[in-house]
Structure formats: C-alpha cells, structure tokens
C-alpha cells in the first residue's frame, strides 16, 4: 500500500498525519541547510563523493541532454551534469525546500555555473514539468523524505522521455550482520552527536537516521519502481548496501 493511501505516514519512527510530513521534513532541512555540505563530508567520511561519482558515471549524460536533479539540495550532481550536457543542454535543480535551493544556487553561481542551470521549487509527487521532457532524472538521498513515494515515482516516469532513465541514490539496508550492527551504533549514537556539534541540531539527525531505517529495502524499492512503470530496473549496492543506486528506464 502506498503511504499516500491513508491519512497517516511515517516521520522517522513517529506516525504523523500524511499532510503534515512535508512541513516537518522542511523544518529539518531549513535547520541544516547552511551546514549540509559539511555534515555530508563528516558523517560519510567523504564517501558520499564516491557514491555520487558512480551515479554520474551511470547516468552517462551527453551534450545536449536535459537532466532533472530532483531533491538536488546544494547542487553536487547539478554541477557535474552542467559540464557534461554543455551549452546546448539543460539541468534543472529542483528541491521542495527553498533553503536548500538558495544554498545550492549560491554555491553553483560562486563556481561560475550559470548558463545551463535553472532552479525550481517542486514537490516530487506532482512535478511541474511537461510530459516526456527529461533524458535523465536523478534523486539522491531525497526519496526517503517523500510522503507518497509511489506518486513521486509515477510523476518522474511521466516527465521522462521514452528511453530516458531514472537513477535513485538512497540509503538502504546493509547486507551483513556485522555491518548492520556497526551502522546502527554509528547512526543512533554518533551521528546525532555530530549534528549537535556541527549544526547545533541533534534532533534533525536523529530523524535522518530513523528515516533511513523506515525507507524500503533494495528489493522493495525495485518492485515499487516496476509497479510505477519503469522497466529494466536493477540496483547496485555500495558500501555493503548502506547505499544503493537503483536504475530504471521508460520505454
């Protein structure tokens, strides 16, 4: 059953009204936006750069393509795609959170990335783009925060061109028991302390750890993508499945 099929959904380990989740998630990212990049480096020990580089390589963007970096936050993927698609291409950095968009826009403009990137505040469940518009859609570490993931996947399928691909980079389920135990200890004991020290906000990082545990596992997300209409869906585990990259096509 889709999370959007009832009036309740998960916000971390809490059960909340479905129509309240977006505001609750927004408050988390308003709080951490300014230190988001620093926390990514610290809490992943820099490994998030490898995960994102693999995503870019898998996307195989070419000059002239249109790319949607959904839940793109501070623009790490957008910056790479901007160079790959060139002057004839287009990259849209979309995020539901205006604080994250502002940080991303400032960071990319400071890097001189201005000509082929646009910024759109958008809800993944109802994307404000035409049908059959993008060659590639990426959503990195954003799907778990969406209230109705099934609706979001259908919305992504709609705006993809036939032959286009969706890449979902997201925290997932470690494959081995020893890694699971170490990951739990890190997520619930160490990560909130880091958040408190760096962002002065332990609660937001407690939510982020909980939201990872509530996110569908690798095979469940694969089935969700297939149900939404994506074909040739598969996934690659990274760092023992702490993160997985799911790929699917529209035909």
From Swiss-Prot:
EC number(s) stated in the UniProt entry for this protein: 2.1.1.163, 2.1.1.201
Q: In which pathway does it act?
A: Quinol/quinone metabolism; menaquinone biosynthesis; menaquinol from 1,4-dihydroxy-2-naphthoate: step 2/2; Cofactor biosynthesis; ubiquinone biosynthesis
Q: Which Pfam families is this protein grouped with? A: Ubie_methyltran
Q: List UniProt keywords, sorted A-Z.
A: Menaquinone biosynthesis, Methyltransferase, S-adenosyl-L-methionine, Transferase, Ubiquinone biosynthesis
Enzyme superclass (EC): transferase
The family database entries (Gene3D superfamilies) matched by this protein are listed as:
Vaccinia Virus protein VP39 (3.40.50.150)
Q: Which Gene Ontology molecular-function terms are recorded? A: 2-methoxy-6-polyprenyl-1,4-benzoquinol methyltransferase activity; demethylmenaquinone methyltransferase activity
Its family?
A: Belongs to the class I-like SAM-binding methyltransferase superfamily. MenG/UbiE family.
State what this protein does: Methyltransferase required for the conversion of demethylmenaquinol (DMKH2) to menaquinol (MKH2) and the conversion of 2-polyprenyl-6-methoxy-1,4-benzoquinol (DDMQH2) to 2-polyprenyl-3-methyl-6-methoxy-1,4-benzoquinol (DMQH2).
Q: What is this protein called?
A: Ubiquinone/menaquinone biosynthesis C-methyltransferase UbiE
| GO process annotations (BP) | aerobic respiration; menaquinone biosynthetic process; methylation
The entry's S-adenosyl-L-methionine-binding residues are 74, 95, 123-124
* HAMAP family attached to this UniProt entry: MenG_UbiE_methyltr
The answer to whether the entry has keyword Transferase is: yes
Q: Which organism is it from?
A: Shewanella denitrificans (strain OS217 / ATCC BAA-1090 / DSM 15013)
Q: Which reaction does it catalyse?
A: a 2-demethylmenaquinol + S-adenosyl-L-methionine = a menaquinol + S-adenosyl-L-homocysteine + H(+); a 2-methoxy-6-(all-trans-polyprenyl)benzene-1,4-diol + S-adenosyl-L-methionine = a 5-methoxy-2-methyl-3-(all-trans-polyprenyl)benzene-1,4-diol + S-adenosyl-L-homocysteine + H(+)
